[in-house]
Structures are given as structure tokens and as C-alpha cells.
A protein has these predicted regions:
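Bacterial Sec-dependent N-terminal signal peptides
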Residues: 1-27
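Short, polar/acidic, helix-capping and beta-turn segments at strand->helix junctions
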Residues: 17-192
């Protein structure tokens, strides 16, 4: 029994030494894990939430919807265009309630996921949501910007779980293009 434990302990030490060598080698070479982990499936989660993605068409001005640089994808600002093609418009604190702003931000999240699906071909390639910059068309005395942009963040966390939690800014704007209620930019990290 004693010799079996010693043999097992020896194998563990050798195994740990091998793992340590591999970690050190990876740190020296800059190698990172680029494989999508088993069981990670934002596409299936999206379906289970009943969220349907939609075509985003071409940009309305001289820009592109997304730019990939290395393992980061930068998304242009997107508005709350609904499935019927209409934008949710108005100023928070004057024309729209916090709840309506939350719903507008949720629509933006669906639109950004649609852009990512078109850009990447598969939402399962998204490693994590890195940064969200939410802009709220708000009256000067409106102060609940975070509650509005929660509509966006809540979708990302619902779809990507812990990987959907992100750094964020939620700021008020005097106006947004076309009087849309909310505009959001996003940065995501992807698996190669």
C-alpha cells in the first residue's frame, strides 16, 4: 500500500512538472488557448431565449458595421431598430420612460449580435464581451442612464453567461442620429 502511494505521488510530481514546463513554454512563446471550450454554446442559448437575429443591411453612412483586429472585433454604434424596421426614437426623461429605454437598449443588443453573427459566422466564436459604450439620448436632468443600458448588458449576460459580463460606460447625450433613443458600441474578443 505504502509503495503504491509513493508511486502515485511520483506520477503526480512528474505530471505537475510537465504541466509547469508546458505553462512556462506557453508564456515564453505567447501561445494562448484559441479553441472554443466544450459545452460553450451562445447560439443555443440565444435560441432558448427566443431571440431571433435579423439582417442589418448596409451601413447608412461611410463606415462598416465591424472591424476585426487580431482577436478583437470592434462594432460601430448601433441603434434600436426593431424587427419591423422602425427605430425607437425619443429622449429619455421627456418622451420615453426608463422601461422604454431599457427595451430600446435590448433591441440594440439584438442588432449587435446580428452584426456579430454576420461578421463571424458563428456566435460560439465569441470568447467574451470586453467593453460596451452605451449612449442615451437624454434630457439634461435625466440621471438613470445605467438603468437604460442594463437592457443591453442583460442580453449579453443572458446569452454569454460570465463571458458576457463587460466593462461599460453609460452616458447621456444631448441628441443621437435620427433622434434614436439609444446607441451602443461594443468590443468583443474572439476565439481564432
Amino acid at each position: 500500500m505504502k509503495s503504491s502511494i509513493l508511486v502515485l505521488f511520483g506520477f503526480l510530481l512528474i505530471g505537475c512538472a510537465d504541466v509547469e514546463k508546458e505553462i512556462n513554454r506557453d508564456m515564453e512563446t505567447g501561445k494562448v488557448d484559441t479553441a472554443v471550450p466544450a459545452g460553450y454554446n451562445p447560439e443555443a442559448r440565444l435560441d432558448s431565449l427566443g431571440i431571433s437575429l435579423r439582417d442589418q443591411g448596409t451601413p447608412v453612412a461611410n463606415y462598416v458595421h465591424a472591424v476585426q483586429s487580431g482577436d478583437l472585433v470592434f462594432l460601430a454604434g448601433k441603434g434600436p431598430k426593431q424587427a419591423n424596421g422602425e427605430n425607437i426614437i425619443g429622449k429619455l426623461g421627456v418622451d420615453l420612460t426608463i422601461e422604454e429605454g431599457y427595451d430600446a437598449a435590448r433591441e440594440v443588443a439584438i442588432n449587435q449580435l446580428s452584426v456579430l453573427k454576420a461578421e463571424l459566422g458563428d456566435l460560439n466564436r465569441i470568447k467574451r464581451i470586453v467593453k460596451v459604450h452605451g449612449m442615451v439620448n437624454a434630457a439634461p436632468d435625466f440621471t438613470d442612464h445605467s438603468k437604460v443600458i442594463n437592457g443591453y448588458s442583460d442580453v449579453m449576460v443572458a446569452v454569454f453567461g460570465e463571458n458576457g459580463k463587460h466593462a461599460r460606460a453609460a452616458v447621456g447625450m444631448g441628441s443621437l442620429p435620427g433622434n434614436m433613443a439609444v446607441e451602443v458600441e461594443m468590443i468583443v474578443e474572439v476565439y481564432e
